[in-house]
């Protein structure tokens, strides 16, 4: 079926897997809520208002939303939260990500997901701790903050590294994607998982039983 009528395309569908753009994903979320179709969202780059709109649609239908659908990244996310909760503020948290030259959002959705996990480990929200840009900043690093750095080049699928650094030691954990197949496989797993679930906003940690 080839059509520009989204509701028609959803007739008989059990789930939609959506890797698109924020505005398109919002239209899809609205249509899924109206047709009781589960919605798996791999799109990144949403602003706060768009995030809130998605949460509203999740009151009516199952939405699985994740900045990264891969098994490895979500296991890493779980580890980041645990490590963050175990370490005190003497350990500075930095997140470095690299993607292909054409990626438009920075930091990546995955980097923000890792940042959110680190913030949860401290009992805070990422908005309270995030430092996204240091260009021109002359002051020292604020204790407890979470820093981000983004690299773009070539055809890199995705690399993410989270470091916890004190005056005397450093813990670093890294994930590197070799193929985009990992995102497809995770999205299919999420769609199958969503079939028996009540309406709500979920993520891959729910799908993989990591929380």
Model-predicted regions and their roles:
Residues 1-7, 89-211:
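C-terminal substrate-binding/catalytic lobe of Rossmann-fold NAD(P)-dependent oxidoreductases
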Residues 1-34:
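N-terminal glycine-/serine-/threonine-rich beta1-alpha1-beta2 phosphate-ribose binding loop
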Residues 14, 20-21, 44, 150-152:
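Short glycine-/small-residue-rich Rossmann-like dinucleotide-binding loops
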Residues 15, 38, 62, 92, ...:
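Residue-level detector of anion-binding/catalytic polar loops
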Residues 23-35, 42-65, 71-83:
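Rossmann-fold NAD(P)-binding glycine/threonine-rich loop
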Residues 35, 59-60, 86-88, 121-125:
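Short helix-capping segments at alpha-helix termini
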């Amino acid at each position: 079926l080839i059509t520009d009528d989204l509701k028609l395309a959803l007739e008989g569908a059990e789930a939609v897997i959506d890797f698109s753009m924020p505005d398109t994903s919002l239209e899809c979320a609205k249509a899924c809520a109206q047709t009781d179709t589960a919605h798996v969202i791999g799109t990144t780059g949403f602003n706060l208002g768009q995030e809130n709109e998605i949460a509203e649609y999740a009151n009516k239908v199952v939405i699985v939303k994740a900045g990264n659908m891969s098994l490895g990244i979500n296991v890493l996310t779980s580890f980041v939260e645990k490590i963050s909760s175990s370490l005190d503020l003497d350990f500075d948290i930095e997140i470095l990500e690299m993607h292909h030259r054409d990626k438009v959002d920075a930091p990546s959705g995955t980097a923000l997901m890792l940042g959110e996990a680190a913030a949860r480990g401290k009992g805070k929200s990422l908005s309270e701790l995030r430092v996204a840009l240091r260009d021109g900043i002359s002051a020292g690093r604020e204790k407890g903050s979470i820093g981000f750095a983004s690299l773009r080049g070539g055809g890199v699928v995705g690399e993410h590294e989270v470091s916890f650094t004190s005056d005397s030691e450093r813990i670093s954990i890294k994930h590197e994607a070799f193929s985009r197949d990992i995102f497809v496989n995770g999205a299919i797993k999420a769609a199958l998982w969503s079939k028996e679930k009540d309406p709500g906003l979920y993520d891959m940690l729910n799908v993989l039983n990591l929380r």
